[in-house]
Amino acid sequence: MLNFSSTRRRAGLVAITAAALLGVSGCQAPVNIEDADVPAWKEKILPAASGAVLEDSGKILNRNPLVKESPNVPGGSYTLTMACDGGGKAYFAVSSSGIKIADAAAACNGSLDVVKIKVPGTGPLSISTSSVDAPLIFAYHVVPAAA
């Protein structure tokens, strides 16, 4: 005769074990920002782009913004492609000749975010990258938009 209580216990143990294994296999280890190889990560995550007028990558280890500038960018339509990893969001404030022209954000989950920007006239183009969710790694490039 079957002992239902031991059969139920065994079935419950199998279900708990299966759920734990599924949960562990679905988890991804968090990125260790301090040890991250940013150039290797950037090569994997951000598609190569010819004709970039501005690009940068690096680590945000605190909440201080990182600013990169290109001195003489012609006016026109551009595409800003961004990625970050480490959790939270990274913010990209785009300015042309000292005037903010766009704000963009990327979710720091290893996916790409793309926005179109319009540069009003020839002059310096800068991007201030920041996050309240530091530490994280980021990469971006600005290329002329396809016609």
Name every feature range the model reports, one short phrase each:
Residues L2-V14:
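Bacterial N-terminal signal peptides that target proteins for export
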Residues L22-G26:
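C-terminal motif of bacterial Sec signal peptides marking the signal peptidase cleavage site
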Residues Q28-S70, A145:
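Transition segment at domain starts
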Residues A52-D56, G98-A105:
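Surface-exposed loop/edge segments in extracytoplasmic proteins
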Residues L61-G86:
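Short, surface-exposed binding/anchoring microloops in extracellular/periplasmic proteins
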Residues G76-L80, I117-A139, A147:
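Noncatalytic modules at the cell exterior or secretory-pathway interfaces
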